[in-house]
Protein backbone atom coordinates (compact mmCIF):
# COMPACT_ATOMS: atom_id res chain seq x y z
CA UNK A 1 0.00 0.00 0.00
CA UNK A 2 1.47 3.31 -1.08
CA UNK A 3 0.92 5.21 2.17
CA UNK A 4 1.56 2.74 5.01
CA UNK A 5 5.31 3.13 5.23
CA UNK A 6 5.31 6.91 4.90
CA UNK A 7 2.76 7.11 7.69
CA UNK A 8 4.88 4.86 9.91
CA UNK A 9 7.71 7.38 9.53
CA UNK A 10 5.44 10.38 10.15
CA UNK A 11 4.20 8.80 13.38
CA UNK A 12 7.52 9.65 15.05
CA UNK A 13 7.26 13.47 14.62
CA UNK A 14 4.35 15.10 16.49
CA UNK A 15 3.50 18.05 18.92
CA UNK A 16 0.41 17.91 21.21
CA UNK A 17 -2.52 19.95 22.65
CA UNK A 18 -4.72 19.99 25.77
CA UNK A 19 -7.44 17.34 25.88
CA UNK A 20 -10.93 18.06 24.51
CA UNK A 21 -14.12 17.44 26.52
CA UNK A 22 -16.69 14.85 25.46
CA UNK A 23 -20.44 15.36 25.12
CA UNK A 24 -22.81 12.59 26.18
CA UNK A 25 -25.97 10.99 24.80
CA UNK A 26 -27.80 7.73 25.43
CA UNK A 27 -28.10 5.10 22.70
CA UNK A 28 -31.10 2.79 22.89
CA UNK A 29 -30.64 -0.61 21.27
CA UNK A 30 -33.37 -2.47 19.41
CA UNK A 31 -33.84 -4.80 22.41
CA UNK A 32 -34.57 -1.82 24.68
CA UNK A 33 -31.21 -1.77 26.46
CA UNK A 34 -29.09 1.37 26.61
CA UNK A 35 -25.48 2.52 26.66
CA UNK A 36 -23.88 5.94 26.90
CA UNK A 37 -22.25 7.48 23.85
CA UNK A 38 -19.41 9.97 24.24
CA UNK A 39 -18.70 12.36 21.37
CA UNK A 40 -16.07 14.95 20.48
CA UNK A 41 -16.13 16.98 17.25
CA UNK A 42 -12.89 18.55 16.08
CA UNK A 43 -13.48 21.25 13.46
CA UNK A 44 -16.72 22.54 11.94
CA UNK A 45 -19.44 19.99 12.80
CA UNK A 46 -21.21 20.64 9.49
CA UNK A 47 -18.07 20.24 7.41
CA UNK A 48 -16.11 17.30 8.85
CA UNK A 49 -16.11 14.24 6.59
CA UNK A 50 -14.25 11.76 8.82
CA UNK A 51 -16.11 9.67 11.40
CA UNK A 52 -14.06 7.78 14.01
CA UNK A 53 -15.69 5.03 16.09
CA UNK A 54 -14.26 3.37 19.18
CA UNK A 55 -15.60 0.89 21.74
CA UNK A 56 -14.64 -0.22 25.23
CA UNK A 57 -11.70 -2.47 25.96
CA UNK A 58 -11.39 -4.66 29.02
CA UNK A 59 -13.21 -3.43 32.12
CA UNK A 60 -15.93 -0.86 32.76
CA UNK A 61 -14.16 2.51 32.61
CA UNK A 62 -16.18 5.36 31.07
CA UNK A 63 -14.40 6.12 27.78
CA UNK A 64 -14.92 9.85 28.32
CA UNK A 65 -12.43 9.87 31.20
CA UNK A 66 -9.31 9.33 29.13
CA UNK A 67 -9.55 7.25 25.98
CA UNK A 68 -11.84 9.38 23.79
CA UNK A 69 -10.16 12.74 24.60
CA UNK A 70 -6.77 11.12 24.03
CA UNK A 71 -7.95 9.71 20.71
CA UNK A 72 -9.35 13.02 19.46
CA UNK A 73 -6.39 15.10 20.60
CA UNK A 74 -3.90 12.49 19.47
CA UNK A 75 -5.22 12.09 15.92
CA UNK A 76 -5.63 15.89 15.72
CA UNK A 77 -7.69 15.95 12.52
CA UNK A 78 -11.10 17.45 11.70
CA UNK A 79 -13.44 14.60 12.56
CA UNK A 80 -16.37 13.40 14.60
CA UNK A 81 -15.13 11.02 17.30
CA UNK A 82 -17.72 8.68 18.84
CA UNK A 83 -17.17 6.23 21.68
CA UNK A 84 -19.79 3.65 22.61
CA UNK A 85 -19.45 2.57 26.23
CA UNK A 86 -20.31 -1.01 27.02
CA UNK A 87 -23.71 -1.50 28.60
CA UNK A 88 -23.90 -0.92 32.37
CA UNK A 89 -20.84 1.36 32.49
CA UNK A 90 -21.45 4.06 35.10
CA UNK A 91 -20.89 7.65 34.01
CA UNK A 92 -17.48 8.87 35.15
CA UNK A 93 -16.38 5.42 36.29
CA UNK A 94 -12.65 4.70 36.35
CA UNK A 95 -11.51 1.12 36.69
CA UNK A 96 -8.56 -1.05 35.71
CA UNK A 97 -8.30 -3.82 33.16
CA UNK A 98 -10.34 -6.51 34.91
CA UNK A 99 -14.07 -6.56 35.60
CA UNK A 100 -13.95 -7.75 39.22
CA UNK A 101 -14.76 -4.21 40.45
CA UNK A 102 -17.58 -3.75 37.93
CA UNK A 103 -21.26 -4.31 38.64
CA UNK A 104 -22.84 -7.73 38.42
CA UNK A 105 -25.00 -6.43 35.55
CA UNK A 106 -21.88 -5.41 33.66
CA UNK A 107 -20.19 -8.78 34.19
CA UNK A 108 -23.30 -10.63 33.04
CA UNK A 109 -23.42 -8.67 29.75
CA UNK A 110 -19.67 -8.42 29.10
CA UNK A 111 -19.39 -11.12 26.42
CA UNK A 112 -18.05 -11.00 22.83
CA UNK A 113 -21.38 -11.87 21.24
CA UNK A 114 -22.94 -8.86 22.97
CA UNK A 115 -20.04 -6.53 22.09
CA UNK A 116 -20.30 -7.47 18.43
CA UNK A 117 -24.07 -7.08 18.20
CA UNK A 118 -24.10 -3.77 20.08
CA UNK A 119 -21.21 -2.22 18.17
CA UNK A 120 -22.61 -3.32 14.80
CA UNK A 121 -26.03 -1.84 15.59
CA UNK A 122 -24.51 1.43 16.80
CA UNK A 123 -22.29 1.85 13.73
CA UNK A 124 -25.10 0.90 11.33
CA UNK A 125 -27.63 3.32 12.79
CA UNK A 126 -25.12 6.16 13.07
CA UNK A 127 -24.12 5.81 9.42
CA UNK A 128 -27.74 5.43 8.30
CA UNK A 129 -28.62 8.75 9.95
CA UNK A 130 -26.46 10.61 7.39
CA UNK A 131 -26.10 8.35 4.35
CA UNK A 132 -23.27 9.18 1.97
CA UNK A 133 -21.82 11.92 4.17
CA UNK A 134 -18.58 10.33 5.36
CA UNK A 135 -15.44 10.10 3.25
CA UNK A 136 -13.57 8.20 5.97
CA UNK A 137 -15.12 5.81 8.47
CA UNK A 138 -12.43 4.72 10.92
CA UNK A 139 -12.53 2.06 13.63
CA UNK A 140 -10.07 2.42 16.51
CA UNK A 141 -9.60 -0.33 19.09
CA UNK A 142 -7.33 -0.60 22.10
CA UNK A 143 -6.33 -3.86 23.77
CA UNK A 144 -9.36 -6.17 23.85
CA UNK A 145 -11.21 -3.59 21.76
CA UNK A 146 -8.65 -4.07 18.98
CA UNK A 147 -9.77 -7.62 18.32
CA UNK A 148 -13.40 -6.49 18.26
CA UNK A 149 -12.60 -3.64 15.88
CA UNK A 150 -10.90 -6.06 13.49
CA UNK A 151 -13.89 -8.40 13.62
CA UNK A 152 -16.38 -5.58 13.01
CA UNK A 153 -14.28 -4.17 10.16
CA UNK A 154 -14.27 -7.61 8.55
CA UNK A 155 -18.05 -7.89 8.86
CA UNK A 156 -18.73 -4.56 7.14
CA UNK A 157 -18.11 -2.96 3.74
CA UNK A 158 -18.35 0.68 4.90
CA UNK A 159 -15.21 0.90 7.07
CA UNK A 160 -12.26 2.66 5.39
CA UNK A 161 -9.47 2.38 8.00
CA UNK A 162 -8.59 0.33 11.10
CA UNK A 163 -6.28 1.54 13.89
CA UNK A 164 -5.33 -0.85 16.71
CA UNK A 165 -3.31 -0.29 19.88
CA UNK A 166 -1.96 -3.13 21.99
CA UNK A 167 -3.52 -6.14 20.32
CA UNK A 168 -2.18 -8.63 17.80
CA UNK A 169 -3.22 -11.78 16.02
CA UNK A 170 -3.02 -14.45 18.71
CA UNK A 171 -5.88 -15.84 20.77
CA UNK A 172 -6.07 -15.05 24.48
CA UNK A 173 -5.01 -18.63 25.17
CA UNK A 174 -1.82 -18.14 23.16
CA UNK A 175 -1.16 -14.67 24.57
CA UNK A 176 -1.47 -15.85 28.16
CA UNK A 177 0.47 -19.07 27.52
CA UNK A 178 3.35 -16.99 26.22
CA UNK A 179 3.24 -14.67 29.25
CA UNK A 180 2.41 -17.10 32.06
CA UNK A 181 3.32 -20.55 30.77
CA UNK A 182 1.11 -23.09 29.03
CA UNK A 183 0.72 -25.30 32.12
CA UNK A 184 -0.70 -22.46 34.22
CA UNK A 185 -3.13 -21.47 31.49
CA UNK A 186 -4.25 -25.03 30.81
CA UNK A 187 -4.95 -25.63 34.50
CA UNK A 188 -7.07 -22.48 34.62
CA UNK A 189 -8.88 -23.45 31.43
CA UNK A 190 -9.87 -26.84 32.82
CA UNK A 191 -11.66 -25.19 35.71
CA UNK A 192 -13.23 -22.56 33.45
CA UNK A 193 -14.54 -25.30 31.14
CA UNK A 194 -16.22 -26.98 34.13
CA UNK A 195 -18.15 -23.77 34.92
CA UNK A 196 -18.49 -22.03 31.54
CA UNK A 197 -21.57 -19.96 32.46
CA UNK A 198 -20.37 -18.65 35.82
CA UNK A 199 -20.51 -14.88 36.26
CA UNK A 200 -19.22 -15.18 39.85
CA UNK A 201 -16.10 -17.35 39.61
CA UNK A 202 -13.19 -15.16 38.51
CA UNK A 203 -9.79 -15.67 36.92
CA UNK A 204 -7.45 -12.72 36.38
CA UNK A 205 -10.25 -10.29 37.18
CA UNK A 206 -12.87 -11.65 34.76
CA UNK A 207 -15.74 -14.15 35.18
CA UNK A 208 -15.38 -17.64 33.79
CA UNK A 209 -18.12 -17.04 31.22
CA UNK A 210 -16.04 -14.15 29.79
CA UNK A 211 -13.01 -16.42 29.37
CA UNK A 212 -15.05 -19.27 27.95
CA UNK A 213 -16.34 -16.99 25.19
CA UNK A 214 -13.05 -15.23 24.40
CA UNK A 215 -10.28 -17.76 24.98
CA UNK A 216 -9.75 -19.22 21.53
CA UNK A 217 -10.70 -16.51 19.06
CA UNK A 218 -7.58 -15.56 17.07
CA UNK A 219 -7.93 -12.07 15.51
CA UNK A 220 -5.37 -13.01 12.85
CA UNK A 221 -8.10 -14.44 10.62
CA UNK A 222 -9.95 -11.12 10.74
CA UNK A 223 -6.86 -9.07 9.90
CA UNK A 224 -6.01 -11.29 6.94
CA UNK A 225 -9.53 -10.92 5.53
CA UNK A 226 -9.26 -7.11 5.40
CA UNK A 227 -8.35 -5.10 2.34
CA UNK A 228 -8.54 -1.68 4.02
CA UNK A 229 -5.51 0.13 5.50
CA UNK A 230 -4.63 -1.19 8.97
CA UNK A 231 -2.07 0.27 11.40
CA UNK A 232 -1.14 -1.48 14.65
CA UNK A 233 0.78 0.25 17.45
CA UNK A 234 2.54 -1.90 20.03
CA UNK A 235 4.84 -1.59 23.03
CA UNK A 236 7.96 -3.75 22.95
CA UNK A 237 7.56 -4.46 26.68
CA UNK A 238 3.81 -4.99 26.69
CA UNK A 239 3.11 -7.28 29.66
CA UNK A 240 -0.54 -7.90 28.71
CA UNK A 241 -0.17 -9.01 25.08
CA UNK A 242 3.15 -10.29 23.67
CA UNK A 243 4.66 -8.15 20.91
CA UNK A 244 5.22 -11.38 19.00
CA UNK A 245 1.47 -11.58 18.40
CA UNK A 246 1.59 -8.28 16.50
CA UNK A 247 4.65 -9.37 14.53
CA UNK A 248 2.68 -12.48 13.57
CA UNK A 249 0.00 -10.32 11.94
CA UNK A 250 2.61 -8.57 9.82
CA UNK A 251 4.42 -11.82 8.97
CA UNK A 252 1.22 -13.58 7.92
CA UNK A 253 0.06 -10.58 5.90
CA UNK A 254 3.35 -10.42 3.99
CA UNK A 255 3.26 -14.18 3.41
CA UNK A 256 -0.22 -13.75 1.91
CA UNK A 257 1.03 -10.97 -0.38
CA UNK A 258 -0.90 -8.27 1.50
CA UNK A 259 0.59 -4.76 1.80
CA UNK A 260 -2.28 -3.02 3.63
CA UNK A 261 -1.10 -3.70 7.20
CA UNK A 262 1.55 -1.65 9.01
CA UNK A 263 3.08 -2.19 12.45
CA UNK A 264 4.90 0.26 14.75
CA UNK A 265 6.65 -1.27 17.79
CA UNK A 266 7.95 1.25 20.35
CA UNK A 267 11.15 0.19 22.17
CA UNK A 268 10.68 -0.06 25.92
CA UNK A 269 6.98 0.86 25.76
CA UNK A 270 4.19 -0.84 27.70
CA UNK A 271 0.63 -1.86 26.85
CA UNK A 272 -0.43 1.81 26.64
CA UNK A 273 2.61 2.77 24.52
CA UNK A 274 4.23 4.62 27.45
CA UNK A 275 8.00 4.36 27.93
CA UNK A 276 10.08 6.20 30.55
CA UNK A 277 8.06 9.39 30.38
CA UNK A 278 7.49 9.25 26.61
CA UNK A 279 3.86 9.21 25.43
CA UNK A 280 4.19 7.14 22.28
CA UNK A 281 0.42 6.63 22.15
CA UNK A 282 -0.12 10.19 21.01
CA UNK A 283 2.74 9.93 18.53
CA UNK A 284 1.13 6.85 17.06
CA UNK A 285 -2.33 8.39 16.86
CA UNK A 286 -0.98 11.60 15.36
CA UNK A 287 0.79 9.79 12.55
CA UNK A 288 -2.27 7.65 11.82
CA UNK A 289 -4.51 10.72 11.78
CA UNK A 290 -2.21 12.59 9.42
CA UNK A 291 -2.09 9.60 7.10
CA UNK A 292 -5.88 9.44 6.93
CA UNK A 293 -6.37 13.19 6.52
CA UNK A 294 -3.74 13.46 3.78
CA UNK A 295 -5.03 10.47 1.84
CA UNK A 296 -1.73 8.62 2.12
CA UNK A 297 -3.53 5.68 3.69
CA UNK A 298 -6.11 5.36 0.91
Residue ranges and their predicted role:
Residues 21-46:
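N-terminal cap/lid segment of alpha/beta-hydrolase-fold proteins
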Residues 45-76, 83:
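Short, surface-exposed "cap/lid" segments of acyl-processing enzymes
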Residues 102-129:
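Alpha/beta-hydrolase active-site loop
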Residues 155-202:
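Hydrolase active-site cap/lid region
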Residues 226, 232-234, 238:
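Short beta-strand/loop motif that positions the catalytic acidic residue
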Residues 267-298:
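Catalytic active-site module of serine/aspartate enzymes centered on a nucleophile-bearing elbow/loop
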